[in-house]
Amino acid sequence: MQKKQKIDRKGALYMAEQLTLTWIGHSCFKLDCGDYTIVFDPYEDGYVPGCPPVRESADLVLCSHDHKDHGASHLVKRIEGRENPFQIQVIHTWHDDQKGALRGRNQIHILDDGTFRMAHM
């Protein structure tokens, strides 16, 4: 059975009653699961034209690669001490077709809490 989805006008996609996925800008998203928060691919201030500065707090920050438009984990305020509800699988890939020679490594994160599964690339 597929869960109902609803997209609101603020960019949040509700996948389940206690899961909220919010687009921050560019490739940056915030996933709230109950009281646990993950931010994906925060970008440096002013580096992505038209995107607001990343001013989020999170239990965990996951970056697909270490470029300024995806790897500014230092901008996210960390929340300590809460248990991660997800099993996280990391698949290492290349950011180009030259085995990383041009743009480096990339990581795909697959999150699974037993009822919800998503990938961020």
Locate each region found by the language model:
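Short, Lys/Arg-enriched N-terminal segments with co-localized hydrophobic residues
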Residues: 1-14
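Core dinuclear metal-dependent hydrolase active-site scaffold
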Residues: 11-60, 67-68, 77-121
